Amino acid sequence: MKKGIHPELKLITVKCTCGAEHKFWTMKEDIKIDLCSNCHPFYKGDTGSLIVDTEGRVQKFRNKYGDNY
């Protein structure tokens, strides 16, 4: 392999909105995520609320079309 042409890998901490932190090797500087395996309903075993809407799109759709779609 040629030297100096490959990007440098860094160990970064990925931060979730729930407060969990995960370490990954990547070329990026900083990553923030909305959901991780600690707070996602699927991984927590909550199968009743698999719709995760962080921006209100589901409620906006239901307000526009009702429950009879």
Swiss-Prot record:
Q: What does the record give as cofactor?
A: Zn(2+)
Amino acids binding Zn(2+): 16, 18, 36, 39
Q: Where is the signal peptide?
A: none
Q: Determine the domain of life of the protein's source.
A: Bacteria
GO CC terms for this protein?
Answer: ribonucleoprotein complex; ribosome
GO molecular-function term, one example from the UniProt record: rRNA binding
Q: Which UniProt keywords apply?
A: Metal-binding, Ribonucleoprotein, Ribosomal protein, RNA-binding, rRNA-binding, Zinc
Q: How is the cofactor bound?
A: Binds 1 zinc ion per subunit.
* Xref: Pfam families: Ribosomal_L31
Give the UniProt record's GO annotations in the biological process aspect.
translation
Please give the family membership noted in the entry.
Belongs to the bacterial ribosomal protein bL31 family. Type A subfamily.
Q: How does it assemble?
A: Part of the 50S ribosomal subunit.
Q: What does this protein do?
A: Binds the 23S rRNA.
List the HAMAP family hit by this protein, alphabetically. Ribosomal_bL31_1
Q: What is this protein called?
A: Large ribosomal subunit protein bL31
The gene coding this protein? rpmE
